[in-house]
Amino acid sequence: MSISMALFSPPISSSLQNPNLIPKISTSLLSTKRFSLISVPRASSDNGTTSPVVEIPKPASVAVEEVPVKSPAESSSASENGAVGGEATDSSTETVIKYQNAKWVNGTWDLKQFEKDGKTDWDSVIVSEAKRRKWLEDNPETTSNDELVVFDTSIIPWWAWMKRYHLPEAELLNGRAAMIGFFMAYFVDSLTGVGLVDQMGNFFCKTLLFVAVAGVLFIRKNEDLDKLKDLFDETTLYDKQWQAAWKEPDSSTVSSKK
């Protein structure tokens, strides 16, 4: 059987028998075919057909920046210079305003400069201290241990305060009370015929006396009348608002709105 198969098999070509005649495929063609199989097809603008395009990835360039490293000594010196510079700028920008007066020496008033005829003029001391405190209200300043304020108003005697503030006010009140009392006594004497001495034992006259004293204390100036009027309006304001909330609108105003 094997002999018959060998007889009917076609003859082997001489070119296949000779190994030198086998065509060699170049590596360049193999490499292009290999890339063509994995490449992405791109449409041609001429006939609409797709043609393989080989895209070769490019290496990405990485830029490395070198950061200079400072030594601890340089960093500490830089921080100190920055702190000194900041303090310099702060000191240059801050403007300190302090109270200055020729009579204000070492945190107190020099009482020798307030002497008149060998005696201290306490009225001038009170006025100067009032002006200094008013200036401090408008221009506050910080205190320090180097410049202590040792002045105290307790060094001013009590009679100086009374002479400065109480006596002028008391003179006004006493004068007004005397005028009002004399007018009321004359009015009672003209109506009833009771004299001034007899009025001191009368209950009605004593009541008028207390009314006069209270009026003099509460109404010292003409501006006090406006203050009392404002207080009276304020006490009755909420009552007026409450009554206005419950008041019905007039029929004339409602018809005009319609």
From Swiss-Prot:
Phenotypic effect of disruption: No visible phenotype under normal growth conditions, but the double mutant plants lli3:1 and lli3:2 are dwarf with yellowish green leaves.
Main location, first listed in the record: plastid
Keyword annotations: Chlorophyll, Chloroplast, Chromophore, Membrane, Photosynthesis, Photosystem II, Plastid, Thylakoid, Transit peptide, Transmembrane, Transmembrane helix
Record note on quaternary structure: Interacts with GGR. Forms homodimer and heterodimer with LIL3.1.
Membrane topology according to the record: Multi-pass membrane protein
Keyword Nucleotide-binding: no
One cellular component term from this protein's GO annotations in UniProt: plastid
Protein name: Light-harvesting complex-like protein 3 isotype 2, chloroplastic
Lineage of the organism: Eukaryota, Viridiplantae, Streptophyta, Embryophyta, Tracheophyta
Domain of life: Eukaryota
Record GO biological process: photosynthesis; positive regulation of chlorophyll biosynthetic process; positive regulation of phytol biosynthetic process; positive regulation of vitamin E biosynthetic process
Function: Light-harvesting-like protein required for biosynthesis of phytylated chlorophylls and alpha-tocopherol in green seedlings. Functions by anchoring geranylgeranyl reductase (GGR) in the thylakoid membrane, leading to the stabilization of GGR activity. Binds chlorophyll a in the thylakoid membrane. Plays a role in the regulation of chlorophyll biosynthesis under light stress and under standard growth conditions.
Induction entry: Down-regulated by light.
Region (Disordered): 66-92
The UniProt record lists the keyword Lipid metabolism: no
Subcellular location: Plastid, Chloroplast thylakoid membrane
Transit peptide boundaries: 1-42
GO molecular function, one term: enzyme binding
Residue ranges of the TM segments: 177-197, 199-219
Tissues expressing this chain: Expressed in photosynthetically active tissues (at protein level).
